[in-house]
């Protein structure tokens, strides 16, 4: 194996960049997905604080996902076609969840007090849908896109675990960014 040959090291570089992009997405968008799933708990004032803590960052975090998928498409177009064909439904549902989150976040900011409850629920549903679908896709990918009941069950289990992991990251974010009763509630949600 000649490491000076571009055909040897270039795929390794692209896989490393894709891995970095997906890791950054999971960490950076994971905390705001987690905060979104924690949004149903708390009073209206606490919900404002929770949304305010992610407000400046949440939209830019999804850029890492776009970068990772873009690298997959440009570096490995055949793999991109196979993976997205196998994961068409969960990818579509994840995109629906991400779009719902964006709409809910923007409309919530302009909504009257009576309507904020609806947009909070929409933000929660979008966050839960996106995180669960990401976990399901990860589980399906790990097993090689199985069509068996056991493979589907594994994907569902990983979906639940990824959602729980994002809630953990979101609670840690709230512990760092808030104080008082909301911070104590975030600490309790860890245990």
Segments predicted by a language model, with ranges:
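Loop-centered beta-sheet repeat module
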Residues: 146-191
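Membrane-embedded alpha-helical segments in integral membrane proteins
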Residues: 13-16, 67-79, 136-144
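Transmembrane alpha-helical segments that form the membrane-embedded catalytic/substrate-channel core
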Residues: 27-30, 99-103, 163-173
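Select subsegments of transmembrane alpha-helices in polytopic membrane proteins
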Residues: 56-64, 123-131, 190-191
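Membrane-interface helix-loop-helix junctions at boundaries between adjacent transmembrane segments
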Residues: 82-91, 100-162
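Juxtamembrane membrane-water interface segments of multi-pass membrane proteins
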Residues: 33-56, 73-81, 105-116, 171-189
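N-terminal signal-anchor module of multipass membrane proteins
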Residues: 1-60, 66-69
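Alpha-helical transmembrane segments and their helix-start/interface "positive-inside/aromatic belt" motifs
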Residues: 12-15, 116-127, 186-191
């Amino acid at each position: 194996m000649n490491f000076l040959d571009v055909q040897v090291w270039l795929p390794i570089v692209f896989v490393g960049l894709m891995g970095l992009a997906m890791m950054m997405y999971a960490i950076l968008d994971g905390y705001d997905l987690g905060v979104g799933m924690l949004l149903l708990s708390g009073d209206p004032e606490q919900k404002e604080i929770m949304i305010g803590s992610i407000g400046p960052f949440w939209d830019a975090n999804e850029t890492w996902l776009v970068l990772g998928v873009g690298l997959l498409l440009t570096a490995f177009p055949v793999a991109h076609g196979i993976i997205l064909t196998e994961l068409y439904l969960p990818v579509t549902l994840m995109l629906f969840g991400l779009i719902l989150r964006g709409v809910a976040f923007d409309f919530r900011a302009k909504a009257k007090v009576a309507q904020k409850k609806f947009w909070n629920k929409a933000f929660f549903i979008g966050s839960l849908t996106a995180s669960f679908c990401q976990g399901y896709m990860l589980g399906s990918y790990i097993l090689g896109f199985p069509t068996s009941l056991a493979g589907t069950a594994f994907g569902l289990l990983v979906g639940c675990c990824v959602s729980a992991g994002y809630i953990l990251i979101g609670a840690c974010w709230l512990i760092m960014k808030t104080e008082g009763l909301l911070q104590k509630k975030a600490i309790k949600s860890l245990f």
